[in-house]
Swiss-Prot record:
Family: Belongs to the P-Pant transferase superfamily. AcpS family.
Cofactor list: Mg(2+)
Protein name: Holo-[acyl-carrier-protein] synthase
GO BP, sorted A to Z: fatty acid biosynthetic process; lysine biosynthetic process via aminoadipic acid
Function: Transfers the 4'-phosphopantetheine moiety from coenzyme A to a Ser of acyl-carrier-protein.
GO MF term set: holo-[acyl-carrier-protein] synthase activity; magnesium ion binding
Sorted UniProt keywords: Cytoplasm, Fatty acid biosynthesis, Fatty acid metabolism, Lipid biosynthesis, Lipid metabolism, Magnesium, Metal-binding, Transferase
InterPro entries: 4-PPantetheinyl_Trfase_dom, 4-PPantetheinyl_Trfase_dom_sf, ACPS, P-Pant_transferase_sf, Ppantetheine-prot_Trfase_dom
Compartment list: Cytoplasm
Organism from which the protein derives: Bacillus velezensis (strain DSM 23117 / BGSC 10A6 / LMG 26770 / FZB42) (Bacillus amyloliquefaciens subsp. plantarum)
Enzyme Commission numbers on file: 2.7.8.7
Length: 121
C-alpha cells in the first residue's frame, strides 16, 4: 500500500550559489557517508550530486508528509546505491518498510521522486 509520494526539482545554479556562499552547506545536507562520496567528485559532479541528494531528501520529506523541519532533518535521510548502481534511500530515525527513489539530472536541473509503500510511526 502506498503511504506517500513526493517529488522535488532544484536548479543546479541555486545549489552552486549556495555552495559558493556557504562552504558548510554540503555538511548540512549530506550524512557522513554521503559527504565522503561527495569529496571524491569533480567540482561539476559535486554540484549534480549535491542537488540530486537535496532533491531526494526533499521528495522523501514530502512523501512522508512532514517536510524538513522539527520531525525530520536532512541528516535523518541517507541516499546510496545498491550493487547494481540503483539509488536507494533510508531514514535513520524512522521505521520505513519500503522506499523507492529515482534521481535525475540535466544541465540545469536535478529532480527526484520518492514513493513510500508502508510506514510505521
Amino acid at each position: 500500500m502506498i503511504f506517500g509520494i513526493g517529488i522535488d526539482i532544484v536548479e543546479l545554479h541555486r545549489i552552486e550559489n549556495m555552495l559558493s556562499r556557504q562552504a558548510r552547506f554540503p555538511q548540512r545536507i549530506l550524512t557522513e557517508a554521503e559527504y565522503a562520496r561527495f569529496t571524491l567528485l569533480s567540482d561539476k559532479r559535486k554540484i549534480e550530486f549535491l542537488a540530486g541528494r537535496f532533491a531526494a531528501k526533499e521528495a522523501f520529506s514530502k512523501a512522508y508528509g512532514t517536510g524538513i523541519g522539527k520531525e525530520l532533518s536532512f541528516q535523518d535521510i541517507e541516499t546510496g546505491n545498491d550493487k547494481a548502481g540503483k539509488p536507494v534511500l533510508a531514514c535513520a530515525k524512522l521505521d520505513c518498510a519500503t522506499v523507492h527513489v529515482s534521481i535525475t539530472h540535466t544541465k540545469e536541473y536535478a529532480a527526484a521522486q520518492v514513493v513510500i509503500e508502508r510506514l510505521s510511526r
